[in-house]
């Protein structure tokens, strides 16, 4: 459907008023009515995000030589993440536009590693638990890789089922920390042992948990090993714009070694303008997202994140207690910010519909039906 561009420009105050009117029907996330899509750390962090983003809104991360400030900020943000996730010396990574982007790049690196270093040809496959994010399906669809989802055991990845699905053409196995449907951390230690035993690339999808789990652990929470502290982990994804409280779109993808990361970039020289290399899929990379991430992380620091995530833990525990008191059953033993629950007599999807009608936005699970 076409839309005619206005013949004449309009004053900004009028355009802004129209935008505000358009948003009148949006979920009131600032009032706490959205459990997904927005990770609200409060007005102070919102202000830091916006001001930092605006300072570099026109700059482009595609040109590190032109904008060394952005290159430095990205390097430091990546370093912060590597440090929090127990990466060894020599580990590497990059910022991306979001979790799907990070996962796509990790799969691309694993595929190219399998072809160049392991000599694999023909149809390749990726093995993951049923609860893993559909971004892996998207990546495999784009790269024509067979996706093999395996049954869960107690709502967690089942290492035995995953090993049974592995063969010589497997380029990657996946664990989540936590999985999005249930908020549960897969047995990464066991998956790491499987990866080492079979010579497999293990990717840990910590898009949800990467920037909350380290601080929950610092606060005394019982968080199992899930990151590069597990020897078999080759790569990780972790979203800055979730519990890192950075502006959208900002995520990170990490690799245990520079040699593994080297399979991620794109380099093309067969055209009339010389060699072009991009570290990730994107060409233009918004400088505002890089700058806002750097600003928020420096503004909060470890103590700030511990405070914010202490509040998340308290809220999750309060929700757990509240739903249990009303006859719901909490799925598993959530340790971070997501809690899923079902009721033996009430359809969770029906509740979801009623919540939406009342201006509350959350997500559902379908196996079993719940919230």
Feature annotation, model-predicted:
Residues 1-90:
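N-terminal entrance/gating region of PLP-dependent enzymes' catalytic architecture
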Residues 38-41, 61-65, 89-97, 238-241, ...:
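A short glycine/serine-rich beta->alpha loop
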Residues 58-65, 88-94, 123, 147-150, ...:
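Glycine- and acidic
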Residues 69-70, 93-100, 128-129, 365-366:
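Active-site nucleophile and cofactor-binding loops and adjacent substrate-binding regions
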Residues 83, 108-112, 294-299:
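Short glycine/serine- and small hydrophobic-enriched flexible loop segments
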Residues 97-268, 272-275:
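Conserved PLP-enzyme active-site core in the AAT-like
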Residues 218-335, 342-344:
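Active-site C-terminal subdomain of aminotransferase-like
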Residues 327-359, 365:
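Conserved PLP-binding catalytic core of the aspartate aminotransferase-like
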């Amino acid at each position: 459907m076409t839309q005619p561009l206005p013949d004449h420009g309009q004053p900004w105050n009028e355009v802004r008023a129209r935008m505000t009117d358009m948003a009148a029907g949006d979920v009131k996330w600032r009032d706490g009515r959205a459990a997904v899509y927005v990770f609200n750390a409060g007005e102070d962090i919102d202000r830091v995000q916006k001001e930092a983003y605006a300072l570099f809104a026109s700059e482009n991360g595609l040109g590190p030589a032109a904008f060394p400030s952005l290159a430095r900020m990205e390097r430091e943000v990546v370093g912060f993440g590597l440090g929090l996730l127990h990466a060894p010396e020599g580990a590497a990574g990059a910022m991306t536009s979001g979790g799907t982007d990070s996962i796509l790049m990790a799969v691309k690196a694993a595929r190219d590693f399998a072809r160049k270093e392991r000599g694999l040809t023909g149809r390749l496959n990726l093995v993951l638990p049923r609860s893993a994010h559909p971004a892996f399906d998207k990546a495999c669809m784009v790269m024509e890789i067979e996706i093999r989802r395996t049954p869960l055991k107690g709502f967690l990845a089942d290492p035995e089922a995953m090993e049974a699905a592995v063969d010589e053409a497997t380029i990657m196995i996946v664990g989540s920390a936590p999985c999005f449907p249930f908020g549960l951390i897969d047995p990464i230690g066991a998956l790491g042992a499987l990866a080492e035993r079979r010579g497999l690339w293990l990717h840990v999808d910590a898009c949800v948990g990467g920037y909350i789990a380290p601080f929950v652990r610092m606060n005394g929470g019982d968080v199992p090993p899930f990151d590069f502290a597990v020897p078999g982990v080759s790569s990780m994804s972790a979203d800055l714009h979730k519990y890192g409280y950075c502006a959208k779109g900002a995520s990170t993808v990490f690799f245990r070694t520079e040699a593994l990361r080297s399979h991620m970039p794109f380099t093309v020289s067969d055209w009339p303008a010389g060699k072009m290399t991009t570290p990730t899929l994107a060409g233009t990379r918004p400088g505002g997202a890089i700058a806002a991430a750097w600003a928020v992380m420096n503004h909060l620091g470890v103590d700030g994140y511990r405070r914010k995530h202490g509040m998340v833990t308290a809220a999750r525990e309060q929700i757990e207690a509240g739903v249990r008191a009303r006859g719901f059953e909490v799925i598993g033993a959530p340790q971070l910010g997501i809690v899923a629950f079902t009721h033996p007599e009430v359809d969770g999807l029906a509740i979801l519909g009623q919540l939406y009608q009342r201006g509350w936005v959350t997500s559902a699970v379908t196996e079993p039906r719940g919230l």
